Amino acid sequence: MPKYLINFVQQYASFRIHELESVARLFNIDIQYNKEDLEFIESLDPEIETPFLYVTVNSEEDIKKICTRSVLIKSVYSIWAETQLLDEILNELHSKFDKQFLSNYMINKTFKIEVESYGSKYNQKEKLEMMQKLKDSPLWDSGKCLMHPTEEQMDKHILWYILTDFGVERQGLVKDFTLLPRKVYFGQRIAKGNRDDIIKYNLSDRKYLGTTSMDPELSLVSANMGLVKKGHFVLDPFVGTGSFILVASHFGAQTVGCDIDIKAMRKEEDCNLETNFKDHGLTSQFLGTILCDNSCPPWRVNSMFDSIITDPPYGIRAGARKIGFKENRKFVPVPEGLRRDHIPQCIDYSVPDVMADLLELAAKTLIVGGRLVYWLPTTPDYKETDLPRHPCLRLITASCLQILTNRWGRRLVTMEKIIEYNDSIHNKSLLVQEDLGQFDPQHKDLRAVVFWKKMGTNEKTKKKEQKKKSVENHLKSKNNNDVINNNSNDTNSNNNCNNENNIENQK
């Protein structure tokens, strides 16, 4: 089985392996790698983190298929030599390959050499010096250098790469030449990752946009985690401006969205959620949107969706709401003639309830083997018991973490339906806490975590009391000043009257 080196993009380290495995499963590709390398690939510690991972697949076509979908893969290489010093590359190359093989390899082919580094930057002069160190190899005896090949010439064009891995923690010391790279690789590029779709679905190019529109890169990753492909039926129950179903339609799925807020789905008559589908030529994949409440969804208990992909509201930019009557309002029946256009009252919808209802919806409507992919808000105090659970769903991963601030972030949670839903057994009203999860979850009152300073409860209460006392003292002081001023004015008025009377008497 051939072995290849994957160079991942630098951000979203904790997403890399999970997206890779999901895409491999999507194409039914057997992919293997050293499990011990996961510590370095997924790490958020700059001292050990690296974007390079060796994988083994059955054929070159398999790795190329993976690259057509993965957005976190930058490039894939077939490595010919690997050392710690660039000067040793030639020795390594000549020890592994016969001289005659190297001489004949480039017959009737063109080539170009590139230099790429992780944790360092090279100027053009330094890159040329590095390339010159490889000039004595017989590999270049029969090939022809071509800097800008045409599309017709790409079939016989080889891109050779010199890759250096210094690591992030060494970045400030590299130019002093005080440290050696952790690794130096030399090989040819086999394929590029699917990074072009990020540009294609760039938020700034969309006519219909909102404050909660998901970043296109993370939307594409979410679709990959949901195993979306042509012919699938995909639902977003909190659709908003439709970022997830837009990229799901791009991959060939039939999509539908739901939301309780009609204004989120329809901005204007000529600018709405469907506008983005029209601009990308995807209207045939878009089935429409439904105005509904996810706490009482309109769907039957029927396995019909292949994937549910969503970003539920959690009260930071947009609060969650559901249909209900507020405590201070009485129930007033809607007249028969007004029911069609009636907009019902809404009340707050707690984040744990949002998550519990979402999993209930997935258990009822996903096919067995279908995936639920959603974003869960989290804090540094996250624990595994924060996760919502359901007997019909199996957790695939919840370790994909996007850190937004030092107080909170969000996790991409992926679950898979494993058994059919039975209302007499699996209805959430019949389940116990152990089945549903969310034991005192950190996302229960996320706004308090995000918008309050990190202080104890007693300190918060004390600060509130001090502020209240300060306001009361200010008002009391103001009232006293008003009384003194009024008394002073009355005294002056009386004195003026007495003076006027004295003058009259003298006259």
Swiss-Prot record:
Q: Which InterPro entries match?
A: DNA_methylase_N6_adenine_CS, SAM-dependent_MTases_sf, tRNA_mtfrase_TRM11
Q: Which family does it belong to?
A: Belongs to the class I-like SAM-binding methyltransferase superfamily. TRM11 methyltransferase family.
Cite the entry's keywords alphabetically: Cytoplasm, Methyltransferase, RNA-binding, S-adenosyl-L-methionine, Transferase, tRNA processing, tRNA-binding
According to the record's subunit comment, the protein's assembly and interactions are:
Part of the heterodimeric TRMT11-TRM112 methyltransferase complex; this complex forms an active tRNA methyltransferase, where TRMT112 acts as an activator of the catalytic subunit TRMT11.
**What Gene Ontology molecular-function terms does this entry list?**
methyltransferase activity; tRNA (guanine(10)-N2)-methyltransferase activity; tRNA binding
Region named Disordered: 459-507
Name the residue ranges with Low complexity bias.
Answer: 480-507
Bias (Basic and acidic residues) ranges: 459-475
Catalytic reaction list: guanosine(10) in tRNA + S-adenosyl-L-methionine = N(2)-methylguanosine(10) in tRNA + S-adenosyl-L-homocysteine + H(+)
Entry GO terms, CC: cytoplasm; tRNA (m2G10) methyltransferase complex
User: Where is it located?
Assistant: Cytoplasm
Gene3D superfamilies linked = Vaccinia Virus protein VP39
Q: What is this protein called?
A: tRNA (guanine(10)-N(2))-methyltransferase TRMT11
- The protein's role, per its UniProt record: Catalytic subunit of the TRMT11-TRM112 methyltransferase complex, that specifically mediates the S-adenosyl-L-methionine-dependent N(2)-methylation of guanosine nucleotide at position 10 (m2G10) in tRNAs. This is one of the major tRNA (guanine-N(2))-methyltransferases.
Q: Which residues form a coiled coil?
A: none
According to its UniProt record, the EC number is 2.1.1.214
Q: Which GO terms describe its biological process?
A: methylation; tRNA processing
